[in-house]
């Protein structure tokens, strides 16, 4: 029995360790999913925004270089060969500049000999015609604030009879768009405790529960103190029915010879006490039927003279 209990305790301990390990892993995974995933998404969005800003800046600088190149080309009067328009379409060049470059593309054959003829012959570089214009790009980031302007001219002097009054500016400032929701604030302090509620009335006593099972037998108690002596008993003479005669006892041993008695008186003594009733004798033989006798006289009332005297204890 003890070995089974030890085995059960070991299995319980091992299961408890497994359950604790599983709960710990689940908690760590849940916290990682709640904290790490939003942080990773925010970081990726930040990287994407940064790359988008850098790409837009590169496109802006490229457009500026092309504008400088065109300006220099117009000033010098020399028109050189411009690269394919398909390459600049991926860099975000505007449709107007692409149109201008496509118009001057065929005229470059007289200078460099690299352009195709206007008669519809194939281009020497093996590139096809420019494709359709792409969709407009995303809006760029807002630029920096400009330099402060020059101070304004001084206002006119007020007249002598004019009194000073409060400034009356009249600006029509439309409401701006709502900003993004801020981070939730910290939990506020606990409020003051409320007033104590009304005390309930006196509850009514419930019904008596069912009788419980009988308890185990208690230990026997110690002996009590001795009681006071009872009142002396009273002898009640109740005539009892004579019991059956006992068996005759065995004869006792012969006694020692007694002392010689005194000379008796000439007068006989009185009758001794009546002895106990003897055993009933055996029934005699049935006699002959006698002649009916004469009616006797009425007998006297019955008495107890036929009963032996009661034997009482000494002192009664």
Curated annotation (Swiss-Prot):
The keyword rRNA-binding does not apply. Residues 127-316 are annotated as: Disordered. This is Cuticle collagen 13. Collagen polypeptide chains are complexed within the cuticle by disulfide bonds and other types of covalent cross-links. Pfam families: Col_cuticle_N (PF01484), Collagen (PF01391). Residues 128-157, 176-202, 206-235, 240-266, 269-304 are annotated as: Triple-helical region. One of its GO terms (molecular function) is structural constituent of cuticle. Residues 205-217, 241-251, 307-316 have a biased composition (Pro residues). Residues 1-36 form the signal peptide. It comes from Caenorhabditis elegans. Nematode cuticles are composed largely of collagen-like proteins. The cuticle functions both as an exoskeleton and as a barrier to protect the worm from its environment.
């Amino acid at each position: 029995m003890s070995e089974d209990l030890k085995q059960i305790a070991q299995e319980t301990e091992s299961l408890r360790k497994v359950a604790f390990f599983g709960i710990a892993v689940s908690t760590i995974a849940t916290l990682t999913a709640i904290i790490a995933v939003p942080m990773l998404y925010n970081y990726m969005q930040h990287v994407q925004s940064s790359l988008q800003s850098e790409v837009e800046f590169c496109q802006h600088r490229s457009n500026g270089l092309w504008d400088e190149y065109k300006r220099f080309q117009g000033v010098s009067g020399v028109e050189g060969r411009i690269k394919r328009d398909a390459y600049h379409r991926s860099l975000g060049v505007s449709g107007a500049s692409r149109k201008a470059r496509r118009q001057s593309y065929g005229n470059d054959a007289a200078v460099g000999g690299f352009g195709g003829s206007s008669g519809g012959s194939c281009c020497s570089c093996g590139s096809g015609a420019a494709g359709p214009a792409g969709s407009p790009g995303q809006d760029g980031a807002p630029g920096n604030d400009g330099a402060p302007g020059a101070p304004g001219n001084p206002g006119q002097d007020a007249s002598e009879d004019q009194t000073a009054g409060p400034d009356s500016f009249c600006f029509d400032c439309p409401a701006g768009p709502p900003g993004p929701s801020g981070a939730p604030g910290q939990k506020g302090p606990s409020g003051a405790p409320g007033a104590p509620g009304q005390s309930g009335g006196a509850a009514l006593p419930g019904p008596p529960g069912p009788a419980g099972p009988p308890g185990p037998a208690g230990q026997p108690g110690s002996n009590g103190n001795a009681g006071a002596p009872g009142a002396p008993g009273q002898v009640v003479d109740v005539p009892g029915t004579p019991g059956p005669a006992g068996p005759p006892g065995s004869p006792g041993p012969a006694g020692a010879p007694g002392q010689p008695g005194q000379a008796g008186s000439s007068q006989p003594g009185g009758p001794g006490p009546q002895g106990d009733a003897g055993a009933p004798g055996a029934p005699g033989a049935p006699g002959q039927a006698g002649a009916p006798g004469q009616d006797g006289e009425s007998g006297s009332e019955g008495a107890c003279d036929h009963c032996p005297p009661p034997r009482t204890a000494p002192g009664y």
